Amino acid sequence: EIAQNLGSGIPHIRTKLPNGQWCKTPGDLCSSRSECCKAEDSVTYSSGCSRQWSGQQGTFINQCRTCNVESSMC
């Protein structure tokens, strides 16, 4: 199974969330977009929490993802 590119190589801004925890990086499990770190280049890249298939778990999971806004995969 080929792992999906979740944008882990794209520079992002590490910020503390209102709950005191650090934002989650691409590939981390999430429940909402606000938990995910934003890309440094917010014009070129979009960040969010998206549903991905996990072959390991045999179910869908939500993971932080950063992708190019011009990509059809974003």
From Swiss-Prot:
InterPro entries: Cys_Knot_tox (IPR035311)
Record flagged with keyword Transmembrane: no
Domain of life: Eukaryota
Tissue spec. comment: Expressed by the venom gland.
Record keywords, A-Z: Disulfide bond, Ion channel impairing toxin, Knottin, Neurotoxin, Secreted, Toxin
MF-aspect GO terms: ion channel regulator activity; toxin activity
Family named by the database record: Belongs to the neurotoxin 21 family.
Entry note about domains: The presence of a 'disulfide through disulfide knot' structurally defines this protein as a knottin.
UniProt name for this protein: U1-cyrtautoxin-As1a
Species for this entry: Apomastus schlingeri (Trap-door spider)
